[in-house]
Amino acid sequence: IVIDPEREYLALAAAFGGQIIQISAGTGTRVNPMDIVLEDDSASDPVKDKTNNVVSMIGALIGGIDGLDPLQKGLVDQCVSNLYTRYRNQGGGVVQPTLQDLHDELQAGGDQVSRYLADALNPYITGSMSGFNGQTNVDLSNRFTVFDVSGLSGELRTFGMMVVIDQVWNRVIRNKANGRRPWLYVDEFHR
């Protein structure tokens, strides 16, 4: 797995039959930040772990420099936890929760803070930065996968990198179950 901010590994991936996944707001590529692996054999609860990750991602996305305040964090945590609990109770499956589902869950809260958070998510649901809203539509299982993050800029950079790292972690969990060890190379890590 390669995280490539300057498009230096695309030719290598193409030459070896690798998968190139372009991560940016303007592509048709979707990598769902809310993808979850329920078959985690670690001692921790995958729903709680993933909920914590999503709360951090949402904080980076709409919380600004200071992140979410405690009330906002609590509301996002509760909504995400509700989504994943329903997903797990329905047996998991292909259709994972999405940012749209989180938006709808927040909107259903009805209180002022929930509506504020739902409104803050709007640009990432239907607006110009909606590239992360929807089901993952790329193959993340190729043994040579390059995440091309060169198109991430501004406020989406931190969020996009968090999504990619989360997908890498999902891959680690799946590979562990299959007895495979992934290799991760992050180019320009200092950025």
Would you name each region that the model predicts?
Residues 7-19, 25-27, 32-191:
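P-loop NTPase motor domains
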Residues 4:
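Conserved functional hotspot residues or short segments at active or partner-binding sites
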Residues 1:
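Glycine-rich phosphate-binding P-loop
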